[in-house]
Amino acid sequence: MFEKAFTLAALAALVCPALCAEWLTDFEAARQKAAAEHKPIIMDFTGSDWCGACMHLHSTVFEKPEFDAFVKDRFVLLEIDCPHGDKMPEEEKARNEALVTRYAVRAFPTVLVLAPNGDVTGGFLGSGFSMEKIQQELQQGLDNFARLEHAQSLAGQEKLKALGEFYNALNNDARPCAVSLEEQIIQADPQDTLGFAHRRQVEQQRQQIKKRTLMLMQRRDPQEIMATVEELKPTVMPENMHMLLEMKMTGSVLAAQSEDDLAKLRDSLQAELDTLPDSPEKAETASQLKATFSDIPHLFYQVKAVRARKAQEEKLMQ
């Protein structure tokens, strides 16, 4: 029995290299192989010693025969591991961390489909998907590879328009990672006829406001919050005014002295929100406003509790 099991294990070890998908670990080597074979790359950002979702994705998808059969002759596979431990040489770890920055990776696992030149053509975040769903996303990235090649083959305004349409058609997981393609479009469009430069400015300001908001929430000082609102108001782009309104809502709620103050504040904020142009962000702010003021007595109770806790913290620090 032991000899039979040993023989089967040995046979599997011999057969697997020929059948199992090969994952490269060097970005430039993967690009060269993809260019030589005219294939897109599947690039998996993983954390092999800490990311449970990454391990789940590997065990339930990447290590399955169905996945091997799907990617065979279609893709070059590339694993970018970002371990927390010291099992990886520092030089390789630095290269991988640079790729995390280059592709604006914001969650693990992130799986991207790339053209051989490194441009993003598709991808997905997370691990809670079926094999069928993942194959659909990867197939979309493969199909987009051909579309991107066509767009790159054009010239002038026709090329610019095609690249813009390609970028906008990327799914919500892949689009933020397509930093290089976005930069190509911006550089080719100095008059910003497609609005990409403006959109980037809006997003950059949005991230700056988020950082300020996080710091303000830690201190929970209504006067500081309202002062920040006044400071930012002259420079905030119209697309980001909803964020200023949310900040104002937080500061004003913390400053409220009665339930009547909160009721008046609700009406004032709603009137201000009504002046903003319709957008998905405005709709989210409207939902947040409604939820915040849905139970004013309970909200005022929470405000008093925050004040009491803050006063206690300040007393302990004296």
Question: What feature does the model see in each segment?
Answer:
Residues 2-15:
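Sec-dependent N-terminal signal peptides
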